[in-house]
Amino acid sequence: MDDDVVSISNLQRQILYSEAEVGMPKAIQAKKRLEALNSSIQINAYPNRLTTENAAGIISQYDIVVDGCDNFATRYLINDICIEQKKPYVYGAICGFEGQVSVFNYGNQKKNYRDLYPDEEEMQRMPPPPKGVMGVT
């Protein structure tokens, strides 16, 4: 799920895309690339933004949610819907050479993203990371 289009500045760190896809929807191009690698997989691409209006309906279709988004508002939204729907939430984030990954709301473990970052307003006020995330994965 991504409402953005491929830009030339993505290419050094987002390996699903090439110059040929610049200007095209990221979600659709990622789906095409992954299906070209393995034709037996099923991918549902959502070339739009996750919102309070569509999140519950989309998340309800899946058993587990894996999140690699780049903003706190979306992380809190995913977290809250996963709690509501009793879905495990796998969270991943990167800034520079530092990364985080965690699993929330799994089995009897009731810890969630808000336990890790309880102050949503404070997180929203944090400055964005500097440009130039290194593509070292």
Model regions: which residues?
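Adenine nucleotide-associated cytosolic modules
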Residues: 1-137
